[in-house]
Amino acid sequence: MMAAERGAWICFEDEAGHTLRPSKARTWAPRGRTPVIPVSGKGSGRISVAGLVCVKPGQRTRLLYRVKVHRPRKGERRSFAETDYAALLDAAHQYLKAPIVLIWDNLNTHVSVAMRELVANRDWLHVIQLPVYAPDLNPTEGVWSHLKRSLGNLAVTGVDHLAAVVKNRLKRIQYRPDLLTSFLTHTGLTLDPEPP
């Protein structure tokens, strides 16, 4: 059944991780003065971000996300668990107030038995798996690319500072539906139904 027939939002999900090590980017400096970004090297930890780019004809494109801070603890999972994804999807359903057609990759957490059970308990949710090795079909990858470029050469003081900066940058992207739509356009996917 097509999303339009159900009045559903089409949501593309993906996840990304960020560490305290700053990503390198190009910059300008006078000749002979190599710019140096001081990094303490102290502390550790990382953050994971799960995001949904949600589209529906006649509505502005939306970005919904969750940020999870990971501090190095023995035996602790360093990514999102099935219950974290379910909480994100429940929040998206409550926010969008409509059924969701979810399109995501074949990450082991997405195809696990526990995740299939969580999906089966949500009658408003229909899941479609992206083909293997096809990140170019997911507009959320464009969000991560844009976010990574905005974090270039940024030295953070700790994992909490990194989480705050990432949330701030994602908030900026949220207020730019034209940018979010451009990520969808870049994939080559369209919302127009194919003619019979």
Task: Kindly give the residue locations of the regions a language model identified.
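Short functional hotspots at interaction and active-site rims
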Residues: 1-196
